[in-house]
Amino acid sequence: MLKPSRTHLTLRHEPHWIPAGLIHRLKSPRQLHDWLLDSSSLTAKIRIGCPEMDVRILSETYEKPLISEAHHLKIPLSQKTWIRCVFLMCNGQPIVYARTVIPYWKTGNPWYALKHLGNRPLGEVLFQLPNLKRTPFQITQTHAQNWPHLDLEDSKQIKTFARKSTFIQGKYPLLLTEAFIESSL
């Protein structure tokens, strides 16, 4: 069940990210491994089982990234970035929390056009782009309460299993984190 959102600028407990090859170290449900490791479009994969999947925007703003995001993107902690947090919903239930972080947010950045994305899933755009590069996944497990702009009832008890990778167009990165909500698995 959703609750009103609260704003976070930093996580209370930043997750510890590990390379996806170490997935056996996560205490994650076995059926989730394919989802965490699949490099194809998550949107397309979800739509196989949930054709009516939709997007609920939680936040879309210009703000400072999390410490781990700034380190991953090799940018100063004080640098503001474009951040979009959404739920991917199936039958009215949130199943994935997705967080997009784009540094160097200006008109010369090829990602700048995403400001008009609205309620469309990011995956519909990403996987249509030619010459797009993607870094290997990193994975983690953390409680739902630790993700910015994510509020669920009992979020202190709800675990998420997440993956992140960077998409690169030219010299411009886009960091995408996708957290699978345990209670919806």
UniProtKB/Swiss-Prot annotation:
Substrate binds at R84, L122, E178. Belongs to the UbiC family. InterPro entries: Chorismate--pyruvate_lyase, Chorismate_lyase_/UTRA_dom_sf. One of its GO terms (biological process) is pyruvate biosynthetic process. GO terms for cellular component: cytosol. It comes from Hydrogenovibrio crunogenus (strain DSM 25203 / XCL-2) (Thiomicrospira crunogena). The keyword Cytoplasm applies. It is an enzyme of class 4 (lyase). Removes the pyruvyl group from chorismate, with concomitant aromatization of the ring, to provide 4-hydroxybenzoate (4HB) for the ubiquinone pathway. The keyword Nucleotide-binding does not apply. It catalyses: chorismate = 4-hydroxybenzoate + pyruvate. GO terms for molecular function: chorismate lyase activity. It holds the Pfam family Chor_lyase. Its EC number is 4.1.3.40. Pathway: Cofactor biosynthesis; ubiquinone biosynthesis. This is Probable chorismate pyruvate-lyase. It is found in: Cytoplasm. Keywords: Cytoplasm, Lyase, Pyruvate, Ubiquinone biosynthesis.
